[in-house]
């Protein structure tokens, strides 16, 4: 079970050992002793100012170093304990699949046409279960949701950071699950994975619904705020010491921001496993996603016209995270035949705030793909489109 939880992060094990050793070392560190005065035998050799300065420095430097080491060790141990407590409280809810050296945590619900849901930055499978989307869609689809690499209980090797890399992993994972063709819904950062999957494996993706996405490069404050823990070595130290503490302080405000102008739903506040978001490995995943978001769309934007599947673009009209005009509306203009839906008065988290609209978009886009595939009358009768909600 340890490999499914904190043991999956090798850096965590090293920090745990180092923190324990550091705490023990600071307990044993002797206090700085006052410098002994030596008789001056040769006034030409002595330097009173230098000798006195060195003694003063030794009196404050040793306690300062000891205090700093103790503070770092205490922060590491506190964060490790918080990580273990979060995982005890919120254990894995699905199964594990090993794909291309990556351990993927996933759930599968329902029967019918395969439908893959891809979550955004900072979240995990529960983003779709808590919203009620999974249970409702499972009434007529085979719903598959993965924790993207580094989130929830999926591992994240170094280098597995771009939407295209995630799309290749999804393709291989779906092949292991026997999925030959699937409808796909991506939300926020997950829209980039969904688009990359449709571009790289058009034979696999039947239809595409893109929710609250980011598709064109613009300056975003969150990319600068979230990126530092992605820096090798320095970022590793940050995410085991100060980053979880800072994230814990700012998380309530960030959650309010993604739901604005609507309030945070009581169900989300009560059921979503927020402590899992503060673990070091997940902070690294979120930081890497933030750092690579703009470079990723700079590459992907040149290929949107190559999409060959039915596409629906859905967003909250008052999204406080992704600029609707510069992102969703522009993509709609550049994708002939796409459908665009802007939900008035809603922000970024549309599947929580308007699940009926998201489900309807998934159903109608999947039906368009059936019609474009030329289903015969017998097939249409056997698989009628779901009633509009």
Role assignments for model-derived ranges:
Residues 219-223, 243-306:
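Conserved alpha/beta-hydrolase catalytic His-Asp/Glu region
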């Amino acid at each position: 079970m340890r490999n499914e939880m904190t043991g999956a992060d090798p850096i965590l094990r090293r920090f745990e050992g180092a923190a324990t050793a550091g705490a023990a070392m600071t307990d044993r560190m002797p206090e700085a002793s006052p410098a002994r005065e030596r008789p001056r035998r040769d006034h030409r050799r002595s330097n009173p100012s230098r000798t006195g300065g060195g003694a003063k420095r030794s009196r404050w430097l040793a306690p300062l170093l000891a205090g700093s080491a103790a503070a770092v060790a205490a922060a590491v141990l506190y964060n490790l304990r918080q990580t273990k407590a979060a995982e005890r409280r919120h254990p894995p809810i699905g199964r594990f699949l090993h794909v291309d050296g990556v351990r993927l945590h996933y759930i599968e619900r329902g029967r019918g046409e395969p439908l893959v849901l891809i979550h955004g930055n900072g979240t995990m499978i529960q983003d779709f279960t808590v919203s009620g989307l999974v249970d409702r869609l499972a009434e007529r689809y085979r719903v598959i949701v993965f924790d993207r690499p580094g989130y929830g209980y999926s591992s994240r090797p170094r280098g597995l950071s771009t939407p295209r890399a995630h799309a290749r992993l999804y393709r291989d994972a779906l092949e292991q699950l026997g999925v030959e063709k699937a409808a796909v819904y991506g939300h926020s950062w997950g829209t980039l994975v969904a688009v990359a999957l449709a571009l790289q494996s058009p034979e696999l993706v039947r239809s595409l619904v893109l929710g609250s996405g980011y598709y064109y490069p613009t300056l975003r404050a969150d990319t600068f705020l979230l990126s530092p823990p992605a820096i090798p070595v320095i970022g590793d130290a940050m995410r085991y010491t100060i980053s979880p503490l800072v994230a814990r302080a700012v998380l309530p405000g960030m959650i309010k921001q993604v739901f604005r102008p609507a309030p945070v739903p009581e169900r989300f506040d009560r059921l979503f496993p927020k402590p899992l978001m503060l673990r070091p490995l997940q902070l690294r995943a979120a930081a890497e996603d933030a750092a690579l978001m703009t470079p990723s769309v700079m590459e992907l934007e040149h290929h949107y016209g190559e999409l060959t599947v039915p596409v629906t673009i859905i967003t909250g009209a008052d999204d406080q995270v992704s600029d609707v005009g510069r992102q969703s509306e522009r993509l709609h203009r550049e994708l002939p035949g796409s459908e665009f839906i802007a939900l008035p008065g809603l922000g970024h988290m549309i599947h929580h705030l308007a699940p009926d609209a998201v489900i309807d978009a998934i159903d109608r886009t999947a039906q368009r793909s059936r019609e474009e595939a030329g289903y015969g009358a017998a097939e249409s009768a056997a698989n009628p489109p779901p009633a509009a909600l």
